[in-house]
């Protein structure tokens, strides 16, 4: 183990030695000689052969030569400590290599280098993690999770290679964002435009930025984008973002209001509502999304009704929407969305987008 640990350490400091060698060539020659010896030892270990004991002794003698002269009785315990530290170095190095490989595979298959907490990965797109952010798991649970993540990564490889058809995951009533309805200066998507799917949580800031990016880039004009609102639920049964469940219920209630109507009679309160939440601001300049999250349940409900009135909803519309948001129909829609998200699309974070035959984790970036 001493030989392998020495090779790891020598390999890591190689770049610094290369710089020093410019000024001290003898130092560089001594380093390369030691590195070759260490590599020869590693090669023998790989071939299940014994390392040269003289190299191991050379390493120990270099480290202990002053101790031998001054404190000879310390040599044996210090030699044992060197062996232990060598084992630790090798284990840590192997763990680091495996973790790096796992992170790269996760980034390729799942779109995040951190399977459990996608939002903690700085290499992927911005995303809201599922479930609780805090990690109070003990060492055994963390170790078990480390191995479980390998299974998740390999299980995701077929999904990474498959051709994703967004329309397969639509849930009725399907809400297609009409850019023309949101902004008269924009064009509505053509009937033959490709389909796309946005799986969003109305309280997630990454979802807000993703929606804005799509709106500004013309994505809603070039694609027929279906919106599925999926309020992230915590382990205790509550919701990650305040009032996201309420907003989702109102969203699907307004979608049901247009169900069965001819295109010219549809009111598009659903698209207008999600547009207001993701792009709007209060008179004081606060983002509508964060404003709704700061309200109590009853206050948020009253504010949503005010939004609908702004969109032209009549008293009859408001009564029907209030009835629908508590109905079994909306509960069934949310259950179908949950099933599509967790069991069919197998999301690892929000937003999750499907377009151009691929599944994408994180906010849309043009």
Name each region found by the language model.
Residues 208-301, 305, 348:
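Structural alpha/beta surface segment adjacent to cysteine/selenocysteine redox centers
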Residues 21-24, 91-109:
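Membrane-interface motif at the C-terminal end of an N-terminal transmembrane signal
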Residues 1-53:
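Hydrophobic alpha-helical segments
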Residues 58-93:
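Loop-to-transmembrane boundary segments
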Residues 8-13, 45, 83-94:
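Hydrophobic alpha-helical membrane-embedded or membrane-associated segments
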Residues 45-61, 121-131:
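Cytosolic juxtamembrane regulatory segments of multi-pass membrane proteins
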Residues 103-245, 326, 330-346:
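Extracytoplasmic thiol/disulfide redox context detector
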Residues 298, 302-366:
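C-terminal cap of thioredoxin/glutaredoxin-like
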């Amino acid at each position: 183990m001493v030989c392998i640990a020495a090779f790891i350490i020598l390999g890591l400091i190689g770049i610094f030695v290369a710089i020093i060698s410019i000024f001290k060539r003898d130092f560089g020659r001594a380093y390369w000689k030691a590195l070759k010896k260490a590599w020869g030892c590693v090669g023998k270990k790989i071939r299940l052969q014994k390392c040269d004991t003289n190299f191991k002794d050379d390493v120990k003698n270099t480290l202990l030569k002053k101790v031998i002269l001054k404190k000879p009785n310390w040599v044996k315990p210090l030699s044992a400590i060197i062996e232990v530290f060598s084992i630790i170095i090798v284990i840590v190095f192997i763990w680091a290599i495996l973790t790096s490989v796992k992170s790269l595979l996760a980034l390729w298959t799942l779109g995040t280098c951190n399977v459990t907490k996608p939002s903690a990965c700085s290499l992927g797109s911005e995303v809201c993690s599922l479930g609780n952010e805090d990690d109070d798991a003990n060492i055994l649970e963390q170790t078990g999770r480390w191995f479980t993540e390998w299974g998740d990564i390999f299980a995701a490889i077929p999904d990474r290679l498959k051709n994703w058809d967004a329309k397969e995951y639509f849930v009725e009533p399907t809400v297609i964002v009409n850019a023309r309805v949101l902004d008269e200066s924009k064009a509505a998507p053509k009937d033959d435009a490709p389909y796309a799917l946005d799986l969003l949580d109305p309280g997630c800031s990454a979802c807000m930025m993703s929606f804005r990016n799509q709106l500004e880039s013309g994505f809603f004009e070039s694609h027929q984008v279906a919106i599925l609102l999926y309020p992230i639920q915590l382990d205790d049964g509550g919701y990650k973002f305040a009032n996201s469940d309420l907003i989702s219920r109102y969203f699907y209630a307004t979608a049901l209001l247009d169900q069965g109507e001819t295109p010219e009679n549809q009111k598009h309160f659903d698209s207008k509502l999600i547009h207001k939440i993701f792009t709007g601001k209060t008179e004081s300049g606060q983002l509508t999304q964060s404003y709704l999250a700061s309200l109590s349940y009853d206050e948020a409900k009253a504010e949503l009704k005010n939004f609908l009135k702004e969109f032209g909803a009549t008293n009859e519309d408001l009564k029907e929407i209030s009835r629908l948001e508590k109905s079994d129909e909306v509960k069934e829609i949310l259950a179908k969305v949950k099933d599509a998200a967790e069991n069919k699309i197998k999301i690892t974070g929000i937003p999750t987008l499907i377009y151009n035959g691929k599944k994408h984790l994180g906010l849309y970036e043009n």
